[in-house]
């Protein structure tokens, strides 16, 4: 069965969206000592929420009864997608190494595929399972720089617990986004979820600001929040929502695997970090995995 035009767009977004998320690696690297994690997450989703709401405000007003009726669902999605997957990553990044973050987050597509197959009854055959395994192998190959024996030397620290929590949270967010149908368009739905996320983040941010011993917001900190709002916030989440709707949670989950590869590309472009053969090998495995997961049965 050929892909529809919407599904073709969703497949194209699989290769575009990780570039937006890759920006978050740069933001997370620059944030410590500049802006507090909850404040960064709150400003990110406050600004991204406005970007979602402005073009969809008529729809939000039209469906206000639905939003108020399902407020608990939106609050949970906001907590999972904006608080835990936002602030917790920035907190964990203070004490854990980048290799640990990437390795733990690489579990997310596997968890999404398993939960989607068991709970949502999404069709997921053996070749698609092989695709997930290939993509996982590709990203681990890049993270370990082709030296698989170094996997035994990875040390776990307290920050890993924050990243593991964010990984599980992203799995639940992805599956629930697919599970809970909504009359709202992706844009309007994300506006409502962002508003809920800001509400969840607010008390933690107030506590963070009240206990701060240095200025809480500078021009550099605001710039980081704005950057996080526009690309890994507005653009990435909107694209992910569209992909979820058209392709399903399990098939879209492998997009996470492109993140470290795109981050390596951004580091090469912006930070002059070199690219090696293990990057090419990892990319080949990831692309093969994505093809198997998203192929169409005839």
Residue map of PLM features:
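Juxtamembrane helix-loop boundary signature in multi-pass membrane transporters
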Residues: 1-16, 107-168, 278, 284-298
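Glycine-/small-residue-enriched transmembrane alpha-helix faces in small-molecule transporters
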Residues: 1-42, 91, 152-179, 200
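Specific transmembrane alpha-helical segments of multi-pass solute transporters/efflux pumps
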Residues: 20, 24-25, 53-105, 141, ...
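Transmembrane alpha-helical segments that form core, pore/gating elements
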Residues: 26, 52, 112-114, 118, ...
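Membrane-interface helix-cap regions at the ends of transmembrane helices
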Residues: 27-30, 34, 48-68, 137-153, ...
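Specific alpha-helical transmembrane segments that line the substrate/conduction pathway
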Residues: 39-50, 89-123, 128-129, 139, ...
